[in-house]
Swiss-Prot record:
SMART domains per UniProt: HDc (SM00471)
Residue stretches making up the HD domain: 59-272
Residue segments, region Disordered: 1-26
Name under which the protein is recorded: Deoxyguanosinetriphosphate triphosphohydrolase-like protein
GO molecular function list: dGTPase activity
UniProt record similarity statement: Belongs to the dGTPase family. Type 2 subfamily.
Biased composition range(s): Basic and acidic residues: 11-26
GO biological process: dGTP catabolic process
C-alpha cells in the first residue's frame, strides 16, 4: 500500500540547498523544533494550580513527552498483535495486513513533528486565555487553540513570506484535529444574535468556550491541504459526530487522519498520567481524593487494572520517588501496548481509512484518569483563579491594543495592522496576544 506523493508536497517549493539530503518530514521536524513558537512553550504552564515548583511540567516538556509516547505507539502499531482486531473485522490474515499497513505508518520524524506542534497555538493562561480571545473575536471568526496552531504553522511563523513554516501536507493533515470551520462548530455563532451586553471583565467560561475547527481566515490553506482527497472523502472527513440539538451545543467532527489519531492518543495518555503525577508530587491531590477514582477503576472491565490498581495507588502516593515513577511507567506502558488498528470504511484515502484506537475497556480506564485530572486538578480553585485572572488580563489587553494599535503594538505587528482590513486588524491583535507566554503577557499587562 502506497501513499499519494501529494502528501509530501509543500505550498511553496523549498529552495534547493547544497548537500541537504534530509527527507521531507525531517525538515518539518527541524522547522518546528527551531521555531520561536515552540521555544515559547517553555514559559507556558501545563497546570496552573501547581505554582512555583521546579518539578512541574510546562507545555514544552509536555510536548516532548507526547512525542516520546507517540513514537512508542508507532512502534506498537508495527507489531502483529496490534492487527488482531482489524484482521477479525476484515476476515483477513493479520500478517498480510501487517505487511501492507506498516508502509503507511508515520516515520519517527513525522510523529514527533506532530507532537511537538500540537500545542504551539495555545494562548497564555490555558482555557481562560482561550475564552478571552474567543470573546474578543466574537464578530471576527472567534478563537480556538487548535485553530491557532494551524494558522501559526501555515501563516504566522516567519519561515516564508506567506506560508508560515511551509510544512508538508501530511504533517499539516496530522495536526488538524477538527477538519471544519470554527464558526460552524462554535455555538456562539448559531444563536441568531451574538450577545454583547456583557461586561468583558465578567465573561463566563461556559458561555464563550469555543467549538473546534479552523479559522475562516485560513480557509484557503485548509482547502489546499485537502486537495488530494476525493470529493466523497472530503465531505466525510468534515462530518460532525451529530447534528446540533441545542443552540449552545459545541459540535465536534467525527474523523481524524491516521497520524492525528496517534498523536491524540499520545496527548491523552500524557495528560491523564503525567499531569496526575505533577498534581500528586506537589500536593494538589491527596490519596483520599484519589480513592474516588480507585473505586471506579476497581469495577472496570480491564483485568490488569482491577488486579493492580491497589498496589499502583500505593506506589503513586509513596514517599519513595522511584516507586511512583515505576507506577507511572507501568500505566503509560499499559495504555501504549493496547493500541490497535481501526478501519473507517467510508474512506478511500489510506491516511483517513485507518486510525489508531484503544479498546473500549481501556478507553474506560483512560477516561477515569482524565475525569479525575479534570475534576481535581483543572477545576481546582487555584487553577481556575489563575486562568480567570489571565482571562481578564487578556481581554483588557486586547481592548487597550485595539484602542491605539499604532502606538502600543510592536513595530512589525503595527505595520501589519496598518495594511490590513478591519477584520484582519482584529486577527492581527489576537495573533500577537495568543503568541505570548504566561510570564510575557503578565509583563506587558503591567507595562500597560
Amino acid at each position: 500500500m502506497q501513499i499519494n506523493s501529494s502528501w509530501q508536497e509543500r505550498f511553496l517549493a523549498d529552495p534547493p540547498r547544497e548537500k541537504d539530503h534530509r527527507p521531507p518530514f525531517r525538515r518539518d521536524r527541524g522547522r518546528i523544533l527551531h521555531s520561536a513558537a515552540f521555544r515559547c512553550l517553555q514559559a507556558k504552564t501545563q497546570i496552573h494550580a501547581i505554582g512555583e515548583n521546579d518539578f512541574y511540567r510546562t507545555r514544552l516538556t509536555h510536548s516532548l513527552e507526547v512525542a516520546q509516547i507517540g513514537s512508542s505507539i508507532v512502534a506498537q502499531m508495527k507489531l502483529i498483535d496490534s492487527f488482531i482486531y482489524l484482521a477479525q473485522q476484515l476476515k483477513e490474515d493479520r500478517a498480510d495486513l501487517q505487511k501492507q499497513l506498516k508502509l503507511i505508518l508515520p516515520s519517527n520524524d513525522l510523529i514527533e513533528s506532530l507532537c511537538f506542534a500540537h500545542d504551539i497555538g495555545h494562548p497564555p493562561f490555558g482555557h481562560g486565555g482561550e475564552v478571552a480571545l474567543n470573546y474578543m473575536m466574537r464578530h471576527h471568526g472567534g478563537f480556538e487553540g487548535n485553530a491557532q496552531t494551524f494558522r501559526l504553522l501555515t501563516k504566522l511563523e516567519p519561515y516564508t513570506p506567506n506560508a508560515g513554516m511551509n510544512l508538508t501536507r501530511r504533517t499539516l493533515l496530522g495536526v488538524v484535529k477538527y477538519p471544519t470551520i470554527l464558526d460552524r462548530s462554535s455555538p456562539q455563532y448559531h444563536q441568531g444574535v451574538i450577545v454583547d451586553n456583557v461586561d468583558s471583565k465578567y465573561v463566563k467560561i461556559s458561555a464563550w468556550k469555543p467549538g473546534k475547527g479552523i479559522f475562516r481566515d485560513d480557509l484557503k490553506m485548509f482547502e489546499w491541504l485537502l486537495e488530494p482527497l476525493s470529493e466523497n472523502d472530503r465531505t466525510l472527513f468534515g462530518q460532525y459526530k451529530k447534528e446540533r440539538t441545542r443552540p449552545d451545543e459545541v459540535l465536534k467532527t467525527r474523523y481524524k487522519s491516521l497520524d492525528c489519531s496517534i498523536m491524540e492518543l499520545a496527548d491523552d495518555i500524557a495528560y491523564a498520567v503525567h499531569d496526575l503525577e505533577d498534581a500528586i508530587v506537589v500536593g494538589v491531590v491527596t490519596f483520599q481524593q484519589w480513592q474516588s477514582a480507585v473505586e471506579k477503576l476497581a469495577e472496570c472491565r480491564s483485568e490488569w487494572i482491577v488486579q493492580t490498581i491497589s498496589s499502583l495507588s500505593q506506589k503513586l502516593f509513596s514517599e519513595l520517588h522511584y516507586e511512583r515513577k515505576n507506577a507511572i511507567g507501568a500505566l503509560v506502558n499499559y495504555f501504549i501496548t493496547h493500541v490497535r488498528w481501526k478501519i473507517n470504511n467510508g474512506f478511500s484515502e489510506p491516511l483517513l481509512r485507518y486510525n489508531a484506537e484503544l479498546p473500549d475497556e481501556v478507553i474506560e480506564v483512560l477516561n477515569i484518569f482524565k475525569r479525575f485530572v479534570w475534576e481535581y486538578v483543572i477545576k481546582h480553585v487555584d487553577t481556575q483563579r489563575v486562568e480567570y485572572k489571565g482571562q481578564r488580563m487578556l481581554t483588557e489587553m486586547f481592548q487597550i491594543f485595539d484602542s491605539d494599535p499604532l502606538r502600543l503594538l510592536p513595530r512589525n505587528t503595527a505595520m501589519r495592522w496598518q495594511k490590513a482590513t478591519e477584520t484582519d486588524r482584529k486577527r492581527i491583535i489576537c495573533d500577537y496576544i495568543a503568541g505570548m507566554s504566561d510570564a510575557y503577557a503578565l509583563r506587558v499587562y503591567q507595562q500597560l
